[in-house]
Amino acid sequence: MHQVCRPLGLVWTDLFREKIFHLGILIKFFLIIALFPVIQLEWFVPFIVNWFEGPKNLPWSGYLLSGGDPLAFPYGLIMFIAHLPTTAIGWAIDNFFAVEYFAHFGFKISLFIVDIFLLLLLLQVFENHWRKILIYYWLSPLGIFITYWHGQSDLIPVALFIYSLTLIK
């Protein structure tokens, strides 16, 4: 028999009661503030910031025309758009205070938002396995290392894939 999933808003409300969730937030926020993954510093964030400074061209051709590294952002438009809002806010703050920190912070926050979205989707679909999902996904050393230490953006296509599967269900 088909089971209807609870709305994400209800899952979100219940999630805030979980101490494991709070522990994961503390760990991940500490890493967001303390770490600067090289791949983000040298490739991803400069690529996006370059487009803010000259948004006339497509991001990839504009970056190459400005002398950027061809390996800088090997992702498509959806990945670019996913990082755009929070990185733009950070870039605006950087320009206001004449620093170079908040664009990087904004980029990392976009990954954190997607991480929470993916957690919500998993909790929504696998309603009877909350504790396991919180331990094995939310506190997974592998996920934390790949996303927050190494700085990869692979959570975005994974979250989109899982979301599309929930729509099929």
Which residues make up each language-model segment?
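Multi-pass, polyprenyl lipid-linked donor-dependent membrane glycosyltransferases
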Residues: 109-113, 135-139, 143-162
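Extracytosolic helix-loop segments that constitute the early lumenal/periplasmic catalytic or substrate-binding loops
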Residues: 43-74, 78, 88-95
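Transmembrane-helix motifs of polytopic, lipid-linked glycan transferases
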Residues: 18, 105-130
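Specific aromatic-rich, kink-prone transmembrane helix
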Residues: 120-124, 156-169
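Juxtamembrane loop-transmembrane helix junctions in multi-pass integral membrane proteins
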Residues: 98-105, 148
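Hydrophobic alpha-helical transmembrane segments
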Residues: 18-22, 81, 134-136
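Mobile, glycine-rich extracellular loop/lid and propeptide segments
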Residues: 76-78, 82, 115-118
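Start-transfer (signal-anchor) and selected internal transmembrane alpha helices
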Residues: 1-35, 124-130
